Amino acid sequence: MALSRLSSSSSSSNGSNLFNPFSAAFTLNRPISSDTTATLTIETSLPFTAHNCDPPSRSVTTSPSELLSFFRTMALMRRMEIAADSLYKANLIRGFCHLYDGQEAVAVGMEAGTTKKDCIITAYRDHCTFLGRGGTLLRVYAELMGRRDGCSKGKGGSMHFYKKDSGFYGGHGIVGAQVPLGCGLAFGQKYLKDESVTFALYGDGAANQGQLFEALNISALWDLPAILVCENNHYGMGTATWRSAKSPAYFKRGDYVPGLKVDGMDALAVKQACKFAKEHALKNGPIILEMDTYRYHGHSMSDPGSTYRTRDEISGVRQERDPIERVRKLLLSHDIATEKELKDTEKEVRKEVDEAIAKAKDSPMPDPSDLFSNVYVKGYGVEAFGVDRKEVRVTLP
């Protein structure tokens, strides 16, 4: 499969320091990497398919530092999820656990096309989205193991990661329920006029939920800056899209709402689509992005992932479309990094993950009294009365 067509230029780089915890780890020795103004123009591996709108350009502007950040961050995400699998099998992680390996390009590309003013809300496959928003490995593993240093203080677990200070409004365990909440965030953004948008992520398994269409309708009616992102990994639990949807072209599901189908295994295509969608949403209201992606693990830890699909199918996607390998090829073909440097990066990532796991194991368990905290939000002192204002009087939470 042809990866892309490449060209170099020397103009001001539009790549910002998107992944602060990771980008500092790279030192570049070749001529292209020593030029801070160097840019690359890369054509996406596949064209965008549009519904009720003109598609964005396939030519994406990037930089050596951004590509290196993509590689390292996706490698970190991949290793983080594989290690979580081992921890689950060792009974150090309990309950539900949904892994994201294979889909890393969506989380990384979305970060590259947004700012921390923008909001992201997603379903239960949320570990990598949290990490992309600036979360740390310690917070991830401590939460997965139910420890006090977790991002939700050990009380949320795998499905309920959260980082409000970076605009990440969490993973949510109820299928599709996060989409109306995301549209509510977009309502707040429009009310405050802060020129930001909300990305509400859901899977193909949630695409048939009624509340999704209700939220989309009100968002379109009020021109809210809401971007609905369907992460189509082709299987809702063990059900293939063709078995659950009469029309699996999810980017067209909005009818009167524009949509765009994106190669969700290409981080640069995701970046381009998210920038395009943000510009559209701020001017014209909601838009749907369908990310064509793939998960390597089963739906959850109880799913071997091979009863409803063949191992040949999984290995075929790995060979042809793996998001990390795509970026690796770009880095090597442009002489931005050597194979040894990339392998060294992967070794560093493995070490970081191991160190974070060790620290998370040392984190204390929540105090039993914490069971009763965060049950209700702090009251605003609002009072409710009965019909005659004497019958019933209560202070609302």
From Swiss-Prot:
Q: Which residues form the signal peptide?
A: none
Which compartments does it reside in? Mitochondrion matrix
How the protein is activated or inhibited is described as: E1 activity is regulated by phosphorylation (inactivation) and dephosphorylation (activation) of the alpha subunit.
UniProt keyword RNA-binding present: no
Query: Which Gene Ontology BP terms does the record give?
Result: pyruvate decarboxylation to acetyl-CoA
Q: What's the main place this protein lives?
A: mitochondrion
Annotated pyruvate binding sites: H98, Y124, R125, G173, V175, D204, G205, A206, N233, Y235
Q: Spell out the GO cellular component terms annotated for this protein, sorted alphabetically and separated by semicolons.
A: mitochondrial matrix
Could you tell me what this protein is called? Pyruvate dehydrogenase E1 component subunit alpha, mitochondrial
Q: Which organism is this protein's natural source?
A: Pisum sativum (Garden pea)
Q: What is the lineage of its organism?
A: Eukaryota, Viridiplantae, Streptophyta, Embryophyta, Tracheophyta
